[in-house]
Amino acid sequence: MGDWNLLGGILEEVHSHSTIVGKIWLTILFIFRMLVLGVAAEDVWDDEQSAFACNTQQPGCNNICYDDAFPISLIRFWVLQIIFVSSPSLVYMGHALYRLRDFEKQRQKKKLYLRAQMENPELDLEEQQRVDKELRRLEEQKRIHKVPLKGCLLRTYVLHILTRSVLEVGFMIGQYILYGFQMHPIYKCTQAPCPNSVDCFVSRPTEKTIFMLFMHSIAAISLLLNILEIFHLGIRKIMRALDGKSSSGNTENETGPPFHSTNYSGTQQCMICSSLPERISLLQANNKQQVIRVNIPRSKSMWQIPHPRQLEVDVSCGKRDWAEKIESCAQLHVHSPCPHDRSARIQHPGQQPCHSVFGPKNAMSQSWFGTMTASQHRPSSALETWERSQGPEASGRSLTDRQSHFQGSDGSARESGVWTDRLGPGSRKASFLSRLMSEKGQRHSDSGSSRSLNSSCLDFSHGENSPSPLPSATGHRASMVSKSSHVDSPPHSSFIIHETYVYVY
């Protein structure tokens, strides 16, 4: 037989780019096919034609009967089988080498990029550790000298397994059609020019039968390994997909609803838009994700709060310790009472739910309390105050004054009067801006040197009998000021804004 070194050297390269089942298949191909065929089977079929004898003296009858008994020598048939079954592996090897060169180029580019990152003096410690770990991984890939089996290379690998399986089945069927599973010692020849029926005798029939059964068995084992390898790749891919889904599920459970918390630094905007009750994620400035379920009422509204500091949204549904609220700086606190029916409800995880019912069912009211302060550039002068009182009667006022104290940077307490919106039959007709500016002028004449901070007041109300239109698209701008006084209880529903503007759309 010819030299198998060239084919063996190429298949050794395929061995390094195969799975564990593919390596077993290649081992069987090397040992039980090529080695057995080159060492033992060739000697068994060496005297195949010379020892084939027929009981006739008719010239040419022996050759005709031998050709009819052995259309192709089993040795050559098995050689063709090995070559054809190995050819898909050679095609896969060519693709793997191409991908390996491309992978090496990408690895070099990535290595240069990571080294350039390591030279960056502004790189923090955590990022340096990540880059160093990536460089070590690239060096390990260089030592392995192997391409990851994924993507187009994986598709080529599966295709070459299917192709060699089909070829294996074809050669097994061909061997069965030509010779069956047994080599008979006597062959009846009826071909011309042999007279009538001629008996021909085959040399070493039992030994040849053993080798035929052995090669059939090896072919069946190779086919079984091909099927197992396909299942192995499929199960591994399914397991990876399941692992990816489980990890993504765990991540989603840890981070909460689809809208995750985001840190805003610099001149950013905090926008909340809603037309239906949704689940949203609130912002937090301490680099920790905290997700809160919020049911937003059915109103087409959007409010923007530009602020040059990081914003944090905190939610509570009842009375809290207002000292903790005062100590936090650069935060946006949103408080909403827990309505009884179809109003906004905001509940923090771990917080006891509130069961407060206010107002009749056909005249619901919604109020928000917001506080936003800046940790730097806080004015030292006293804030002017706009306030308006409300009588104890539940007559019909729409603007109600709430007061709260705010602690400044110098430790002094400041009290800010704000307005809230409640439903009333005719009180919305009055312009709160005119009252605001008039009282501001009175306070300004008294204080003289006080400074005022511009802000905007949001007026959100919901009603069924007498709904009021939303503000215009350009938004309202008002000025809110404060004075030095104290209040015993925190406002239940109010909106206080310092050093910012709120636009209502």
Swiss-Prot record:
Taxonomic lineage: Eukaryota, Metazoa, Chordata, Craniata, Vertebrata
Signal peptide: none
Protein name: Gap junction alpha-10 protein
Biased composition, class Basic and acidic residues, residue ranges: 437-446
Family from the record: Belongs to the connexin family. Alpha-type (group II) subfamily.
Ranges in coiled-coil conformation: none
Bias (Low complexity): 447-460
Disordered: annotated segments: 371-491
